[in-house]
From Swiss-Prot:
<dbReference type="GO" id="GO:0007606">
    <property type="term" value="P:sensory perception of chemical stimulus"/>
</dbReference>
<keyword id="KW-0472">Membrane</keyword>
<keyword id="KW-1133">Transmembrane helix</keyword>
<feature type="transmembrane region" description="Helical">
    <location>
        <begin position="172"/>
        <end position="192"/>
    </location>
</feature>
<feature type="transmembrane region" description="Helical">
    <location>
        <begin position="29"/>
        <end position="49"/>
    </location>
</feature>
<dbReference type="InterPro" id="IPR004151">
    <property type="entry name" value="7TM_GPCR_serpentine_rcpt_Sre"/>
</dbReference>
<protein>
    <recommendedName>
        <fullName>Serpentine receptor class epsilon-26</fullName>
    </recommendedName>
</protein>
<feature type="transmembrane region" description="Helical">
    <location>
        <begin position="256"/>
        <end position="276"/>
    </location>
</feature>
<comment type="similarity">
    <text>Belongs to the nematode receptor-like protein sre family.</text>
</comment>
<dbReference type="GO" id="GO:0016020">
    <property type="term" value="C:membrane"/>
</dbReference>
<feature type="transmembrane region" description="Helical">
    <location>
        <begin position="127"/>
        <end position="147"/>
    </location>
</feature>
<feature type="transmembrane region" description="Helical">
    <location>
        <begin position="66"/>
        <end position="86"/>
    </location>
</feature>
<feature type="transmembrane region" description="Helical">
    <location>
        <begin position="195"/>
        <end position="215"/>
    </location>
</feature>
<feature type="transmembrane region" description="Helical">
    <location>
        <begin position="282"/>
        <end position="302"/>
    </location>
</feature>
<dbReference type="Pfam" id="PF03125">
    <property type="entry name" value="Sre"/>
</dbReference>
<keyword id="KW-0812">Transmembrane</keyword>
Amino acid sequence: MFIKLSSTNSTSIFWLPIFFYNEPYWAQCAISSAELPFYMLSAYVVFVSCRIMLKIQLFHDNLMYIGVPMFGSWFLLIAGKLITILYRVRILNVESVKIHENWVFWTDEPEKMLNVQSLDGLVPLLVAGFLEIHFGFSVIFVGLAIVTERVIASMLIDNYEQSTSLLIPISFIIIYQFLAISISLGILFNILGLYVLNASWILCILIGTIMYYYIRKINTKWLQEMQNPNRKRVFTVSQQFQVRENLGAIAIGKRLVFVVLATIVVMGFGIVALVLEITVLFFMHFGENTLFCYPLYIFLVVMNGHPAWKQEFRKYFPKIKIFKKVRPGLVSVEIVEDQKKKLSLETDTYFRQLKSAWT
């Protein structure tokens, strides 16, 4: 939605990735009440997943310092959504503004914008919009930062795993947060247009894709060389670990890419349908919540990416027994005795062969 602030001296326009649907008040309250349990479950999944990733560190510290805050930034995203819900159910309200009739995603027509004379009562809504924009660009830039960190790790394979310096992760965090905050403010205040919005994430994806294939190619080559018994190069234990670490990160990243792309496709079709007014607004709630509830499927992919994470992740969720426990069937004593005799015979044969080999 757009907010157009008109004063005697100037006019300012703000863009927020927030939707308000023209629905009855009871429907808005009911939908908000239905969304909250899913957000609570998502928060629990995020907390558990971040704790497991820090407890069972499968990757280098630098990668964890860069990646884990990205997953934790979901709490900023949901904070923006909760502020929007407060406006939706009219806990936060502006009497002189019909805020609940603005659902246009992007427009240049002033009559489709929210026209106001002041920002009194709307500052929390601007904060919510900034948090959602900032989250999107943080994910984009931190993804590029993770790939770049793995490229540096591959180039410095001789001693990177032994380094404990925090210079690399701190530098990446400062750079990508500076870019995310700067672009988010530029888009919020409508300084950067739609072309810059699209060009920034498209460029990051292209650069990240090139780096991804570089990392996969060089580390696959090193793995094949390590497994070659006639190799001439000597790989240290730390170097072998780093190669497998890079390939493991690539495997998890590949799964995440497919899931994220599917989410973007669903949300993209929903936004297009909303702009063209070819769908019922009620169904847009489902498309919108594919973003806010993404931990329910993104983190499942991450946690199932490694057996150690998967095993630990299951401990935090109670087992639900749907079916009655099946009683074990009766086994004939004769069959058990035959199996024991067969196992004993094979064991005796093995030791006789071993004894004859030493004599």
